[in-house]
From Swiss-Prot:
GO molecular function, one term: translation elongation factor activity
Gene coding for it: efp
GO CC aspect terms: cytoplasm
Subcellular location: Cytoplasm
Provenance organism: Kosmotoga olearia (strain ATCC BAA-1733 / DSM 21960 / TBF 19.5.1)
SMART domains xrefs: EFP, Elong-fact-P_C
Family: Belongs to the elongation factor P family.
Source taxonomy: Bacteria, Thermotogati, Thermotogota, Thermotogae, Kosmotogales
Function, as annotated: Involved in peptide bond synthesis. Stimulates efficient translation and peptide-bond synthesis on native or reconstituted 70S ribosomes in vitro. Probably functions indirectly by altering the affinity of the ribosome for aminoacyl-tRNA, thus increasing their reactivity as acceptors for peptidyl transferase.
Highest taxon of the lineage: Bacteria
Record protein name field: Elongation factor P
Pfam families assigned to the protein according to its UniProt record, in alphabetical order: EFP, EFP_N, Elong-fact-P_C
UniProt KW Transferase keyword: no
Length: 185
């Protein structure tokens, strides 16, 4: 059991016999009395996102998760296939379970899968990935005067704002936690 004040983004909790992944946590404290913790969580089984409100001091059950190092193999429609690097067992995860991580997956990429018991429930990406820019506007002299950047589309379909000097065909390093451009690779 974990106190609701200790809930953090990314934790797995068991509520009403379902496993939820915490997407967002907001803590509100009043001058008198106890605080209120509002959370946004995704149900692993159904994929629905739901909000929960807790009073400080309440306790919830934390789900025990394990990680397995896997390799992303390929995509077939809405299913993504991974192979355990130790046992060579293959797992198929639905696009709804993977969520926004689909924009960072490249074939043969190594990453971790989260498991509850023997069921895969999520993907743990590396902090950064290297992606190729497949579409971006050309740069013109004087673009840098206004600052900012220009939109680019990467090989996985990810849309990211890049500096003006980045061109189509170049590889860039992207932060998987924020979806932002870091540097040229």
């Amino acid at each position: 059991m974990v106190e609701v004040g200790d809930i953090r983004k990314g934790m797995a909790l068991i509520i009403d016999n379902d496993i939820y992944i915490v997407l967002d946590v907001n803590k509100h404290f009043t001058a008198r009395g106890s605080g209120i913790i509002r959370t946004k969580m995704k149900n692993i089984r159904t994929g629905y996102v739901r909000e929960f409100k807790f009073n400080s001091g309440e306790k919830v059950e934390e789900a025990s998760l394990s990680l397995r190092h896997v390799q992303y193999l390929y995509r077939d429609g809405d299913l993504f296939y991974f192979m355990d690097l130790e046992t060579y067992e293959q797992y198929a995860l639905d696009k709804d379970i993977i969520g926004e991580a689909v924009y960072y997956l490249k074939e043969n990429m190594e990453l971790d899968l989260q498991f509850h018991d023997s069921t895969p429930i999520g993907v743990v990406l590396p902090n950064t990935v290297i992606l190729e820019v497949v579409e971006t506007a050309p740069s013109y002299k004087g673009d840098t005067v206004s600052g900012g950047g220009k939109p680019a589309v990467c090989e996985t379909g990810l849309k990211v704002i890049v500096p003006f000097f980045v061109e189509t065909g170049q590889k860039i390093k992207v932060d998987t936690r924020t979806g932002e451009y870091i540097e040229r690779a």
